[in-house]
Structures are given as C-alpha cells and as structure tokens.
C-alpha cells in the first residue's frame, strides 16, 4: 500500500515537504498568494455549474466538503471534476439542478469530465449550460439536457437564469 511505502521512506521525502496545520494550509491569504490551482471532485454538477460534493440524492452523506471550500473560493483557478455518468452509465452526473449545493457558479472556473472540459469563466448561465452539456455531459444524456434547457428558456419568465424546477426534479426519474 502506498501509505506504508511513504512512511517506510519518510526520510527520503522529509526535505521535500512541509506539513502545516489546517489553519495555515487552508488560510485564504496563503492560497491566494501561492496562486493555487484547486482540483476537487464532485458527485454531480448541474448545467449551470453548481456542484454537489457531499450528498447522494441530496440527503445521504457521502463525504464532507473538507477544504474544498477554502480552496475553490481562493484559488487562482478552481476546477471541479467528475465522471459524466454513474451506476454503470444509467445515471447522468450532469443534471439540470444539483440535489444539494456545496459550491456555486460564482466559485467554479472549469468543469471536467472524461467527455471534455468546460471553461466557465465570463459566461452567462445559458452559455454555461450549453457548454457544460456539450463538453461534459455524456452523449447519451445531451439531448435530454438540451431539451430541459430549451423548455426552461421558453417557460421561465426570468430569461437570464432559466430554471424549470419541476422538470429538474423529474429529470432522473425520466432516464
């Protein structure tokens, strides 16, 4: 196991690393000053760029957010990664609305899946949604996600951030 290997060779690594308490390593000023590129994983991301890092179906805790909040808010570049699908390809990890929000569109610079990279900087919500669908969603779910977005745009009175909550909540059931 790699952990055992690390500790067996600790002297080899001793002069190459510095261990600090979380109050220092996760301090916003330290993160900003170093120009950190933060890469965090998510359970799901929505088409607008909000991410869920901690809850399955919005209610079952998978893991905590840890230091991801500190890093994504203060990093020079904040990247989130996920697979495009779960449950052997039957469930999209790119959804109309995440079931729980850990990180918002205001903190995320890029989203990456095995399908591609969506650089979200400077884009409005509809531009972000189209880019995430086209670059990050699995091809088998892209049509349904575009249909959701088109319907939300045509029915939502707030065109700058079109959301159809009922359709978003039913998205997984429809798959």
Show which residues each predicted segment covers.
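Conserved phosphate- and dinucleotide-binding cores of soluble alpha/beta proteins
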Residues: 1-175
């Amino acid at each position: 196991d790699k952990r055992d290997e690390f500790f067996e060779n600790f002297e080899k690594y001793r002069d190459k690393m510095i261990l600090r308490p979380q109050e220092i390593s996760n301090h916003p000023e330290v993160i900003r000053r170093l120009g950190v590129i933060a890469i965090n994983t998510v359970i799901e991301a929505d088409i607008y760029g909000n991410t869920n890092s901690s809850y399955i179906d919005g209610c079952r805790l998978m893991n905590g957010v840890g230091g991801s909040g500190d890093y994504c808010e203060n990093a020079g570049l904040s990247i989130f990664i996920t697979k495009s699908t779960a449950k052997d390809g039957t469930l999209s990890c790119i959804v109309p609305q995440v079931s729980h929000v850990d990180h918002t569109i205001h903190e995320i610079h890029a989203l990456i899946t095995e399908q591609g990279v969506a650089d979200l900087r400077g884009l409005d919500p509809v531009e972000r949604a189209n880019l995430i669908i086209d670059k990050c969603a699995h091809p088998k779910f892209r049509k349904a996600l575009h249909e959701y977005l088109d319907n939300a745009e045509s029915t939502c009175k707030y065109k700058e951030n079109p959301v159809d909550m009922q359709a978003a909540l039913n998205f997984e059931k429809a798959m």
